[in-house]
Regions:
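Glycine-rich phosphate-binding loop of ATP-dependent small-molecule kinases
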Residues: 1-398
Length: 398
């Protein structure tokens, strides 16, 4: 159980009350919180939102008393300003409640004048919410699944078939350009660090497509102190006890830092779908949840890049056999790789729908031809370089 004092609403309500954000910014924030709550509730989280209300005179008297003991009660400038503007605070809170009061995350307003009544009311609200959730669970209610495209549309689209895999890169040219790109990348990522521009980069693609090699060449051009690579495998028991995005939320980079995911949250609509590890209503709902998550990343000064490294079935087979024959590459090949290969058509179908539903204007997919690993590595670094240039230029204009 998590208890949040003020939660994700408190800061936004106070900033709106104090005039530091306008109505459109306030409404956009409320919509983000509403979508977040829907994501959490859809995965089984019980959300209890409580507004403890005080009348104007009582609130003023209590604030006056607390200001006498600031060594105990710590106040921020926003706390003081919003408390002095009681009418504005109540108006902002009422607006927030109206915009975010939903069946899966309702608000409960409690009169907080009497402490005993307040405490009992809070307990009753929590008990009622948990009991209601248990009742729904027993009924095996299936959530409504939002969709953006029909099954007919999806069946006619195959993004991977259109990729030209014939490109090659001469080794001498590759080495020269790689060194130049890595040098430029080092400079750009340091400038981004100084400006507080974060980067979240994720890699998906076929087994043996060269994700690890591309990541190594990418990180070679970034200061090790500001970057980290998160290898993603099957979730642990601790991770399974949380919302499926929790294990990725934990690693979102701080301002100026770079996080690279080797596999990502898209496992929800790839391996979990193909291997039937997740119910259809859950992975279908995930498309909208992932788009919301990525939109929030992009809105917070974060470069988001999504790479799919693509190879042909024949090239994958060649690389698998090479891994079996070369002793120092044996660790790279497992029975799971061969089993996944047998499900190639199912993964193509899952990947096509993923591209269709989650390649957005703010977070497009970059499908990289990786039949020649050298070309793929250069493509990845070029795309990141260009994204850094664009972000730094936009930062300069503000």
């Amino acid at each position: 159980m998590g208890v949040f004092l003020g939660g994700w609403y408190g800061g936004t309500i106070r900033r709106f009350c104090c005039g530091d954000i306008d109505e459109s910014e306030f409404n956009a924030s409320m919509e983000r919180w509403r979508r977040l709550e829907h994501t959490l509730a859809s995965s089984g989280t019980v959300i209890v939102k409580l507004w403890l209300h005080l009348g104007k005179k009582v609130q003023k008297a209590r604030l006056k008393d607390r200001l006498k003991h600031q060594e105990i009660h710590h106040f921020t400038p926003y706390d003081k300003k919003s408390a002095e503007n009681y009418d504005g605070l109540v108006s902002a809170a009422a607006k927030a409640i109206t915009l975010t009061d939903r069946v899966d995350a309702p608000w409960t307003v409690i009169d907080a004048y009497d402490g005993n009544f307040r405490n009992a009311s809070v307990a009753r609200a929590i008990i009622a919410a948990v009991e209601a959730a248990v009742a729904v669970k027993r009924q095996n209610a299936v959530p409504v699944v939002p969709t953006k495209a029909s099954e007919e549309e999806i069946g006619q689209i195959s993004a991977l078939d259109a990729i030209d895999l014939s490109r090659t890169c001469e080794r001498g040219v590759y080495k020269k350009e790689l060194a130049e790109l890595q040098s430029e990348l080092y400079d750009l990522t340091y400038k981004a660090y100084k400006k507080g521009i974060s980067s979240t980069i994720l890699f998906e693609g076929w087994d043996a497509a060269g994700k690890g090699g591309a990541i190594r060449r990418l990180t070679a051009g970034i200061d090790a102190r500001i970057t980290r690579v998160i290898p993603v495998s099957a979730p642990t028991d601790e991770e399974l006890a949380h919302n499926y995005l929790w294990r990725f939320w934990r690693h979102i980079p701080r301002a100026g830092f770079v996080t690279i995911y080797d596999r990502s949250w898209y496992g929800r609509v790839l391996v979990e779908r193909v291997e039937k590890l997740t119910q259809p209503e859950d992975w279908k709902r995930a498309y909208a949840e992932l788009n919301d998550f990525e939109e929030q990343l992009q809105e917070h000064n974060n470069i988001l890049l999504k790479f799919w490294l693509h190879i042909s079935p024949d090239e994958q087979l060649r690389r698998f056999k090479e891994r079996e024959e070369i002793p120092w590459k044996n660790y790279k090949i497992t029975p799971d790789d061969w089993r996944n290969r047998e499900k190639w058509p199912a993964y193509v179908e899952a990947a096509d729908e993923m591209f269709l539903r989650t390649s957005t204007e703010y977070a497009p997919w970059h499908i990289i031809p990786a039949e020649d690993k050298k070309c793929a590595r250069l493509d990845v670094i070029r795309i990141y370089r260009d994204a850094l240039r664009k972000a730094l230029e936009q930062k300069k204009k503000k």
